[in-house]
Amino acid sequence: MNELYAATRFPSKRVAAARSDYHRGCSLAAAMPDPRTVSDRVSRLYTLLFVVCLGLLGFALYLQHWENLDPCPWCVVQRLGYILVGLIALVGALHRPGPIATVVYSTLGLAASAAGAAAAVYHVYLQSDPGRAAKCVGSPVERILDQLDVGAVIPPLLQYSGPCTLKPWAFLWLSIPEWSLVWFVLLGGAFVAVPFVAKRD
């Protein structure tokens, strides 16, 4: 009864309390990130990763067709890795995912990057000793590529004819598969970072 009397007797207090609740709610809403802004940020990051993969594949084509460096089976495997990573990033960019979907895409991208890095590590192992050339010619990977006829899908990019053990090109003392390993590690790290960047206010 006293509360009812106070509410009717002192309406200014009731208005002040309502205003306080309103401003408190506005402050909480402002503190929360806009889902649309987060989705835009994630989409831009995935787009950047897709463009990086396109650039790496374009550089591979340059080395092959302008520098006459024929790819080997393990080169093609790594190119397939870049294609897979790029497709995951592209789908993620077009989807404009929420928090859960962002984690899913980043997990898939990390797995694809890890697989590509493993292929690059094995290629570096083959190049470390020319005597390991026999492990490339007629290897299970070469037979799988032949059975799947991967070269017929994108012939300028996925056909191979070169040996695995030669080091015909280097930049800053790193060979092609060593640079490939560096880029796969960077791409994997970027996929790991995307969900955390998306949470940033």
PLM features per residue range, with description:
Residues 59-64, 115-130:
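C-terminal TM-helix exit segments that contain a strictly Trp-centered aromatic cap at the helix terminus
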Residues 25-39:
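Short, Lys/Arg-rich, polar N-terminal cytosolic tail immediately upstream
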Residues 129-172:
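Extracytosolic (periplasmic/ER-lumenal) interhelical loops and adjacent juxtamembrane/interface segments
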Residues 156-201:
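A hydrophobic membrane-anchoring alpha-helix module
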Residues 39-49, 97-119:
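Interfacial segments of alpha-helical transmembrane regions
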Residues 5, 15, 22-23:
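Short terminal hydrophobic/aromatic SLiMs and anchors at protein ends
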